[in-house]
Amino acid sequence: MQIFGVDIGGSGIKGAPVDLDRGDLAQERHKVLTPHPATPDGVADGVADVVKHFDWSGTVGITFPGVVTDGTVRTAANVDKSWIDVDAATLIGGRLGLPVTVLNDADAAGIAEMTFGAGRDRKGTVILLTFGTGIGSAVFRNGRLVPNTELGHLELHGHDAETRASTKAKEDEDLSWHHWAHRVQKYLEHVEMLFSPELFIIGGGVSRKADKFLPLIEGVRAEIVPAELENNAGIVGAAMAASSR
């Protein structure tokens, strides 16, 4: 069975048909740049471009970088603020003329990792953290998702954690892997103090370079592993969410 998945990010919108039996992309993903400003109409156009690239005519699952409840956006940290209180499912579904499901981006990635990736068969508290333009989070307790946790906005040294420890912060400040890993470690210690997880899964594009920074992180009790689906987890999870609606 195939469902189309789209992952809306702060820098890019990417998608592909997903093979739900294997938990993998059925075709090579297509990506367009996220418009700036990332307004609802502009982003909806970008999603439409990705879906039309595959001439897709079925159900579509879509991730969004913010809190989403019943298809409506509640926060918009890394896209235009005009998204707040927009019914994204109705807007994008109307643009595509297709049934859509919209959910938080990190929640989608977590759903995929818990089923097909690093969290498979893991009990207790598992937290997936996606590092990119911001920091997304997905918290699971015995396999059940606690949605819309947005732990990237925890305060760390007087600032949103994602302004110090995201991949964007590393790039903007030209931080070495060692310096950035120290910031990530402080962030993980803070999250661990609050939730005492058994496992941290590190996702986002930087998960492909886990060997450059994970060995530098010390003092965290929980096991820390890279996401197995890497940066495709959001696409896969979006398709999974759409298939269950």
Task: Please state what every model-predicted region is.
Residues V73-D85:
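A charged helix-plus-loop insertion that forms the helical arch/lid used to bind
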Residues D105, G132, A238:
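Active-site glycine-centered loops adjacent to acidic/histidine catalytic or metal-binding residues
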Residues M1-T59, V68-T72, T90-V100, A112-L128, ...:
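ATP-binding/phosphotransfer module of carbohydrate and carboxylate kinases, centering on a glycine-rich
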Residues N78-D80, N104, N231:
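Asparagine-centered polar/low-complexity signal
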